[in-house]
Amino acid sequence: MGRSRGVPNSGDDETNHRSKRRRVASSGDAPDSLSAACGGAGEGGGKKALYHCNYCNKDISGKIRIKCSKCPDFDLCVECFSVGAEVTPHRSNHPYRVMDNLSFPLICPDWNADEEILLLEGIEMYGLGNWAEVAEHVGTKTKAQCIDHYTTAYMNSPCYPLPDMSHVNGKNRKELLAMAKVQGESKKVLPGDLTPKDESPFSPPRVKVEDALGEGLAGRSPSHIAGGANKKASNVGQFKDGANVAKVEDGHVDRSIGVKKPRYSADEGPSLTELSGYNSKRHEFDPEYDNDAEQALAEMEFKETDSETDRELKLRVLRIYLSRLDERKRRKEFILERNLLFPNPLEKDLTNEDKEVYHRYKVFMRFLSKEEHEALVRSVLEERKIRRRIQELQECRSAGCRTLAEAKIHIEQKRKKEHEVNAQKAKESGQLLSNTKVVHKTNRPMKIESDGNLDQKKGGASLDSTGRDSPKTTGHAGTKHWDDWDIVGFPGAELLSTSEKNLCCQNRLLPNHYLKMQEVLMQEIFKGSVAKKEDAHVLFKVDPAKVDNVYDMVTKKLGTNEEAPTV
């Protein structure tokens, strides 16, 4: 293999090639300060990842080497390559690449060019946010250093998303190394305690890069670098493996890694997630509109053996899927643009009738702009208000009012009278409910729990624990006080004749129960299963006397004989 690695790396060839570039110590033509810094980091990490020649096993880390483009992870030194050395399966006629030594500073004095490449490769491989793996891929930098460098040099660059290369354009390797060496020497004369602002010479809006390079603030050791990164950690969030960080007020950072986004206050309205499942950080709904759009092509794949018809069909499925995504995007943008996730301030002061009109007019939002729709709704509500006022004035004129003062008095009296009528109705309904409590039971008749005094004094029918009416007081007492049982207002009362109403009052039956008993009796009589009163007793869990009375009414209406009804 081209190098020895402490941790084996799995994955495709491209990942192996990139992982091979991981290094722990920088060597070669790098200045002493950089070598010491990288060496210190390597010793702290305790991992070795050096390149070596696959033929002579010579250490070629930090030197120019020849990399085979065909054989994976295969390197040769210049001497072995010059004599055409071959190691199975490598052959001397394989294509190759010349890998130059990149151990020189480029963007920052404390970051070499090869470390920059490893940083970007690590972010591409492990994702932006998996900084522990990225730092391990770089090998010579800590997690905090990687975050701080990427935030400063890339995210906050004036040339975003590219780093600022104006201070190195036109300079060769020797000039860059000399520049880093000068900065390393000037670091010794600087005071040890620096403020956070002085330790950020590579932030273009605050300190010019040329001045920073001249002052030599960047040639500090990794310990100082880590300390500076910790001091600036408030701009990039709290790190799990970082030390105690000091928060620094800095309004410069506009693009940062790990910064908490501002939350919506309670005054701005209900939470987005509570209303619709909208995630403001991802700008997505959960679930999305047409959430099953991806299922149509989840298992679809293009194969070389596909015919033209199959290929055209798959392309059409893709076009349909894209149109569904466009509709999903349109709806989401429409909701966010119209601010439909929060209550409209216009709706707060509306009456219930006006709110109903407001909601009915929401269907026209898709055809109008936001301003046009609000103007339409306001005009409709204003029209309703004017129409109500005109109707009130017409009623006042019909009542004989001739001035606005008289009309105002008439309207107040009318409202007062309506209020009294409503209060009287509510009082009557409350008395009715207090006298009789209706309890609905599933699949059996409704039970009536009357006041105990009425049951005892007026002969009301009581219910035993089995659901059957107790016949002890249902007889003549119920007939004597039948007028006390008023069924007016109960559902189904308007469907009964006078004789049927009297029957319900005498037997203390609800209209719905009577109609149901009548329906069942008619069906059974037509079937022939009920020929006399005793046959109907088993059909209902009520007092047999009530069943007999209902049976008599049904047979009377059918015009049949009580004992032998004709069908």
Swiss-Prot record:
Record-listed Zn(2+) 1 binding positions: 53, 56, 77, 80
Domain SANT: 106-158
Keyword field contains Zinc-finger: yes
Region (Disordered): 1-34, 444-480
One Gene Ontology cellular component annotation held by this UniProt entry: nucleus
Cellular localization per UniProt: Nucleus
Tissue specificity as recorded in UniProt: Expressed in roots, mature leaves, stems and panicles.
GO molecular function, one term: zinc ion binding
Domain SWIRM per the UniProt entry, residue ranges: 476-567
Biological processes, Gene Ontology terms: chromatin remodeling; regulation of transcription by RNA polymerase II
Binding of Zn(2+) 2, residues: 68, 71, 90, 94
Zinc finger (ZZ-type): 48-104
Principal location listed in the UniProt entry: nucleus
Keyword Translocase attached: no
Biased composition (Basic and acidic residues): 446-458
Keywords: Coiled coil, DNA-binding, Metal-binding, Nucleus, Transcription, Transcription regulation, Zinc, Zinc-finger
Coiled coil: 288-308, 405-429
PANTHER family to which the protein is assigned, alphabetical: TRANSCRIPTIONAL ADAPTER 2-ALPHA, TRANSCRIPTIONAL ADAPTOR 2 ADA2 -RELATED
Subunit structure: Interacts with GCN5 and WOX11 (via N-terminus).
Role summary: Required for the function of some acidic activation domains, which activate transcription from a distant site. The exact mechanism of action is not yet known. ADA2 and GCN5 function to acetylate nucleosomes, opening up the promoter region. The ADA2-GCN5 histone acetyltransferase (HAT) module is recruited by WOX11 to regulate crown root cell proliferation and stem cell maintenance of root meristem. The ADA2-GCN5 HAT module together with WOX11 targets and regulates a set of root-specific genes involved in carbon metabolism, cell wall biosynthesis, and auxin transport and response.
Name of this protein: Transcriptional adapter ADA2
Organism: Oryza sativa subsp. japonica (Rice)
